[in-house]
Amino acid sequence: MSLEAEVYQHFADNWTYCTIGWVQENVSFDPTPDEEYAIPAIRHTSARIAEVPVDKGLVRNEYIFAISFLVKENSGMASLEGYVDQLKSLYHKKTIKTANYSVFFGPLVTLNGFYEGAHFEVPNVFDLTVFSQ
């Protein structure tokens, strides 16, 4: 499996706090106003050879793992703060071993929220580092 698929699987196996919206997996997603969601996305941002000679060096791959929370409009911040705390306990500055990778998660960064339809959306991001041959 790809790194993205394995991180998504880890998230799916360990996230039980609100519904996951799989918008990155070619699935139709139509959020309802009375439910809250976590929407994960992963982007590969760079690959660098970390050693010399380059033909034998490890490759350092960098990714961004974003989880946007869609919370009910005008519902306060308590549920959002709980989701962020749970996300921190899963990934903040941790190494996660999947079937084929050791994934190094950086610190959690919570960005400014905004209204999107009937939800208040709050993006949260991690930098991921993975070494490969």
Cite the ranges covered by each PLM segment.
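Solvent-exposed, well-ordered amphipathic alpha-helical segments
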Residues: 40-44, 62-67, 84-88, 105-108
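Acidic-leaning, charged glycine-interspersed low-complexity segments
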Residues: 21, 88-133
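Oligomerization/assembly interface segments of phage tail-like spikes and tubes
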Residues: 59-73, 120-131
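Small/polar-rich, solvent-exposed N-terminal microdomains that initiate assembly or binding
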Residues: 1-57, 75-77, 82-83, 89-90, ...
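Charge-dense, low-complexity intrinsically disordered segments
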Residues: 74, 78, 113-116
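Short, solvent-exposed beta-strand/turn "edge" segments of beta-rich domains on protein surfaces
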Residues: 52-60, 114-119
